[in-house]
């Protein structure tokens, strides 16, 4: 559909004729709280790779998470030393601390303590947390005491995104003995995607995107992909330089209630469509134009024996009436009955 907007002519078919996935399905048989397998289809050829690559990059780099950013160990002046009575040197202890996964419900820095006094293994579960912080992998090894000595760790936790080197943290104390840590804040541990062939009606030249997401448990895989999609949407929307509400719809995506399009009350038989298209609509129990326009293109393509040729034919007819697929018509049945009564009264 060509619509004039100011001194420009906007061709809405640039996007309206593309197939769009109606929803994302989750494979419940293999998914859990830390792993999700999602299927998105159908997509235009090549779009699965484009979307999958963008989602993967954002998932791994841009989501907020919590991590230790600094530690102070009793009796330790710097990272390149050893601790009497501890099997690991300080460098190894620091590396182990970086592997501890945390969940935090506040943006304010939190200060935790780990205190031990008996020989044996020290794990992340020994950290004394508070109401704002949770250790997600309590079995993560930190150090091993070979003697009964008292050892204290003072730990600072912050929220952030991506990977932040130790010297890039802002506002940390410069006191002697405070060891700054490289922090991997991302709650997403791994992302993989594959592209397969999808079918729409009789056509098979479409894409299916299969996206797999592994998280540390601080965010669900479902929320992780939702956040990444929101980030991408917000970043690219600035490129749209025209009013998106240009297809005869108001801001709610509904038919304009000021001038109700009476073409909506037409019978399918009045459209002079091909026999094949008409029969397909009737087999789908679509009798009126108002019922037809509320269907999405994807819904129509799933109708038995309904193909791209019939879709294009119907879209052209609807366009001539100032209508299109995917139009929300609030209270259509009520309006149709009122219109029928009015027609009968005038007759």
Curated annotation (Swiss-Prot):
Residues 260-347 are annotated as: Alpha C-terminal domain (alpha-CTD). Coiled coil: none annotated. GO terms for biological process: DNA-templated transcription. It catalyses: RNA(n) + a ribonucleoside 5'-triphosphate = RNA(n+1) + diphosphate. Keywords: DNA-directed RNA polymerase, Nucleotidyltransferase, Transcription, Transferase. Belongs to the RNA polymerase alpha chain family. This is DNA-directed RNA polymerase subunit alpha. It comes from Nitratidesulfovibrio vulgaris (strain ATCC 29579 / DSM 644 / CCUG 34227 / NCIMB 8303 / VKM B-1760 / Hildenborough). The lineage of its organism: Bacteria, Pseudomonadati, Thermodesulfobacteriota, Desulfovibrionia, Desulfovibrionales.
């Amino acid at each position: 559909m060509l619509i004039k907007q100011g001194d420009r002519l906007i061709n809405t078919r640039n996007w309206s004729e593309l197939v769009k996935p109606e929803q994302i399905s989750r494979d419940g048989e293999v998914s859990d709280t830390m792993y999700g397998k999602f299927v998105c289809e159908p997509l235009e050829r090549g779009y699965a790779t484009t979307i999958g690559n963008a989602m993967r990059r954002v998932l791994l780099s841009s989501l907020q998470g919590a991590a230790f950013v600094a530690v102070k160990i009793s009796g330790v002046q710097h990272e390149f030393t050893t601790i009497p009575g501890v099997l690991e040197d300080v460098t190894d202890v620091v590396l182990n601390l970086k592997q501890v996964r945390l969940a935090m419900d506040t943006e304010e820095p939190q200060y935790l303590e780990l205190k031990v006094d008996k020989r044996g293994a020290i794990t992340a579960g020994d950290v004394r947390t508070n109401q704002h912080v949770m250790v997600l992998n309590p079995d993560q090894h930190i150090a091993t005491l070979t003697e009964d000595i008292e050892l204290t760790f003072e730990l600072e936790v912050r929220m952030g995104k991506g990977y932040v080197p130790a010297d890039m943290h802002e506002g940390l104390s410069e006191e002697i003995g405070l060891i700054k840590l490289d922090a991997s804040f991302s709650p997403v541990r791994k992302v993989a995607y594959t592209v397969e062939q999808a079918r729409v009606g009789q056509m098979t030249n479409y894409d299916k995107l299969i996206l797999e997401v592994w998280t540390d448990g601080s965010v669900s895989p479902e929320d992780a992909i939702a956040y990444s999609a929101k980030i991408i949407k917000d970043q690219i929307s600035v490129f749209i330089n025209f009013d998106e509400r240009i297809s005869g719809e108001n801001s709610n995506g509904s038919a304009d209630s000021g001038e109700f399009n009476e073409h909506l009350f037409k019978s399918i038989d009045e459209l002079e469509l091909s026999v094949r298209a008409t029969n397909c609509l009737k087999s789908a129990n679509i009798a009126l134009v108002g019922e037809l326009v509320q269907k999405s293109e994807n819904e129509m393509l799933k109708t038995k024996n309904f193909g791209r040729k019939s879709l294009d034919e119907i879209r052209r007819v609807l366009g001539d009436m100032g209508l299109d697929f995917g139009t929300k018509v609030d209270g259509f049945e009520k309006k149709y009955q009122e219109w029928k009564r009015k027609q009968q009264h005038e007759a």
